[in-house]
Each structure stands twice: as structure tokens, then as C-alpha cells.
């Protein structure tokens, strides 16, 4: 999708709005971490003889001269082979190379950004991998972005009529339907399918979800609350539906062939994140925490 030209200008209470958004992202992080740890406790099927995993939080600060930092929360468990739930709030100036790509940054390179990012890779091949992020960005303009997408790793589960796919799409459609003045589900669904695509393989990364960016209030600053409420509901719907999908599948036995297929599919995940993902590029270009940025990569991968 082509980047729009966003109206410039910030409301008088922009600092309050920044603090409100940051507090939400951090609250959602804590809620999801508690939920995922509960899943670790609930497992009774394969690998249940292992100890349940727990998140290890790690705070970080940007390098000297750069502003802000964040918290990495990583877990390697018996349900989640690797999951990261991260928040960050950073500020500074975009590099000359990067400022042309960001609305409102060409004349004034200063920026502020806060958000949450999550990627989960499960032990059981029947449990789909998942990604979710939402963020607020401020330059001389302001906007929200984010989305969520599901990646089943077994080909027989990578269909639009699979029960997991149907439930995931329904949850995100509900988030959009609750906010018709600011959210466009058909557009965001199509945007996700266009974005999470590997051109060199001519195949999608997963079964889709939603993707949105540059969601802004323009000169109608009262719309900020409506935009923020939608962003919150994306997080709430994700936090409700994905644990349900895990519960449906995490006790299902799997074969060595299933595990092999999972590892090969993860290779596609690596290819997308390193070649095309805007979030990865944004983090590396703005002096983000490299360990946190690359934590999205799965722990074990295979290229046949």
C-alpha cells in the first residue's frame, strides 16, 4: 500500500496521549505473559513431563546519545519453544536515509514511538505460529499501526476453512466491526495478505489476519481516542483468541514428519523477517535493541 501524506500538527495534550498509549502497551504485555504462562501450566499431552516455562524479563536502554528503551520478555517452555513479548518506547532523530520513508520526518527528523510486539513459535507442530504488534508513532504527524497474523506450519492446516483460521479471522473482524468509523476490515485483511507475502517464493507467509498503518486523527484530534480504542481492541481480541487456539492443539500428538515440516516452514518465516519485514528494518535503522529485534526468529530451522 502506498504511504499517504498525513496532516501535520500535534494536539496540545500529545504528551498525555503518549503516556496513555505506552501504559496500555505495557499492560497488554503483562496480561499476555500471564496468559501464556498459564498455558504452560495446563499442558497434559506431549512434553508435559517437562517443567513449565516462565518468562524472563530483561530491560534495555538504547545506546548513549539515543533516547528510550524497552523490556524484552522471553520464554522457552514446553508449550512455547520460543516466545517473545516485547515493549519499547524510543525517541530521537531518524537518519537522513530513513526520514524520507516516515510521514512528517523529512523537515523535522525527530520522532517518538511506543509499541508492543509478539512472536510465538510452539513446540507442537499443530499449534500455529503467531505474530502481533501495535504501535503509536509521533513525528510532526501522529499515527497508529499494527496487526496480527497466523502461520500454521503444517500444510494440511494452512487452509481458510481450517477451524483455527476461521476463529482467528473472526476475532480480528470483530475488533474492526466494533470501530466502523476508523477500521476497515476488508482493507486491513487484504493489506495483510499483500504484506506477508514472499515474492521470491511466490507464496504467503501464513493464512493472513489484519495489517494497518498510518491510522491518524488528522486535524480532528478527537478521533485519536477512537483510533486508540480500536488499537486496544486488536490487542484484546488477540489476547483472547490465540490462547484458545493453543488449547485446541497443544495436547495433540505429532510425528517426526510433522516436526520436519514445522522446521522447514519456519525457514520461510526467517526469510520474510530478514528480507522484507518493515518492523525489523525500522528497529535496526533506529538504533533499537538487536537482541529484541531478532528474537522473532525461531529457535530451530531447517532448509532441505
From Swiss-Prot:
Presence of the UniProt keyword Phosphoprotein in the record = no
Q: What is this protein called?
A: Oxygen-dependent coproporphyrinogen-III oxidase
Q: Where in the cell is it found?
A: Cytoplasm
Q: Where is this region: Important for dimerization?
A: 269-304
Molecular function as annotated in GO:
coproporphyrinogen oxidase activity; metal ion binding; protein homodimerization activity
In which broad location class does this protein mainly occur, judging by the first location in its UniProt entry?
A: cytoplasm
User: So where does substrate get bound?
Assistant: 117, 133-135, 287-289
